[in-house]
Design a protein with these regions (language model features):
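Gly/Ser-rich helix-loop-strand patches that form or flank binding pockets
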Residues: 4, 116-168
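Phosphate- and divalent-cation-binding pockets in alpha/beta enzyme and binding domains
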Residues: 20, 113, 135
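Structural beta-alpha unit
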Residues: 1-3, 45, 83-126, 163-173
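Short glycine/proline- and acidic residue-enriched helix-loop micro-motifs
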Residues: 61-75, 97-100
Length: 173
């Protein structure tokens, strides 16, 4: 028997294709009466680069960002998601904001954070956008997509790049 899909992890880097993949997450959630957990993983900056950046950080922006722990990012993401849902609801009429159960901003390697969040939130499936950049894209998956596929036992939906007419956007981050 195929397990029920009641919770979906939608992992995003806010690239053009990941926002297109969000449409698939919303559609799947609506059809299956499921909830969506949105994850945005921020990869840590290597120490040697961070040291250089801090030399030029006169106003303490980097320090405040570390202390803040992503709270501003979560609010920004929530606002972008609400804007996207309003546009989508105007197009198709069905609501989408109530399908989102949680928004997570985490700091760490994206593959590790996706797998950890999928387990912690008890998600049934994972939805990722597949960038498909370059002439070898038909042979190799992106490092995040490939890493998730290799290390998870959960179903993973890889959403390919949209055509320009199907493109959607959550706005500039």
């Amino acid at each position: 028997m195929v397990p029920e899909i009641k919770k979906i992890l939608y992992a995003t880097d806010f690239s053009h294709n990941s926002t297109y993949a969000f449409s698939y997450a919303i559609d799947m959630a609506q059809k299956r009466d499921a909830q969506i957990v949105i994850l945005h993983a921020i990869e840590p900056i290597p120490p040697q680069i961070m040291a250089r950046l801090e030399m030029y950080d006169n106003q303490g922006v980097l320090r405040r960002a570390r202390i803040n722990g992503g709270n501003e990012d979560i609010e920004l993401i929530k606002n972008r998601v609400k804007e996207f849902c309003k546009k989508r609801e105007a197009q198709i009429g069905s609501p989408c904001v109530e399908r989102i159960s949680k928004i997570v901003v985490s700091f760490g390697h994206p593959v590790d954070e996706i797998l950890k969040t999928a387990d912690e939130e008890r998600c049934d499936v994972i939805i990722l956008g597949n960038h498909g950049k370059g002439f070898l894209s038909h042979t190799f998956l992106g490092s995040v997509s490939g890493g998730v596929l290799q290390r998870t036992r959960k179903p993973v939906f890889m959403i390919p790049l949209p055509s320009e007419k199907d493109a959607v956007d959550l706005g500039e981050m």
